[in-house]
Amino acid sequence: MKRLALLAALTLLPTALAVTLYKSKASVPPAMPDLIVDQKRLLQNWVVRDEKLPASFCSVEEGGITPGEHALLRFTVSTPNIGTADLFVGDPNVHFANNDGLFEYATCHRHFHFRHYALYELVSVDTGTVWRAAKRGFCMIDVEKYQAYPGPSNNDRNYLACGAPATATEPAIPGNQGISVGWADTYVWKLGGQYFVLDGGDGQPVVPPGDYLIRITVNPPFVALNGEPCPNVDSHGLCHQLPESNYDNNVSFIQITIPDHPGKQGVGPLKNQPQLTAEPID
């Protein structure tokens, strides 16, 4: 009888093993990118100051800003990929030709703008009023290693080219956009559009002195307009341009105090930085 029981158990073993292996494989989630906003980087890199914005700056043209001296809040944004797979976008020339909704063309600096990549908001702590930043476009590349990444530290950067379309006299420049695992795409405070206009020079209401949140959302949700592509849908039915394993960790914010008269030297961690005479583009 014991032999029969043992034989029966051995007969069922392959089936049980197969079921166990199947369950094990089925429970492993697919490798996916996961974008966050580096709150520490934001906290350490902002300044409120008076600054001259000439008409030649593309951010002035694209943001509808009146040229001249303005009170600005400049800041740095870093968006690391802490997921298990690279965020691959590829060549914007191909996406633009396919009209898939990922990119639009900015004529000011012969540059593609990735749509719905990040949302910059300045929020009044007292009233909840929201102001938008001057930033209008983004190019995703591996700018710097994210030191807090919990995974392997020896992964390489793979995405280094924004790309540009052809002109009447110049050929197209192939791009290769994306963010490698453990790397971050970073937009430093000096770049075009990395600021809020505080004095109403961009057509928005004046930002009065007081306490505010700088709120950054990477890969923000949006409602697709009629005919607009919706590449990825979250659990709330909202669209996202990029696929991620987790859409719930895409927002970060810091609280700051905006003074009445910041002056040219400014107030904040980046005070006393030289005034800008040119506007680097990303």
Give the positions of each predicted feature.
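Positively charged n-region of N-terminal signal peptides that target proteins for export
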Residues: 1-4
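Bacterial N-terminal signal peptides
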Residues: 7-16
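Extracellular/luminal regions of secreted and cell-surface proteins that mediate adhesion/ECM remodeling
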Residues: 19-282
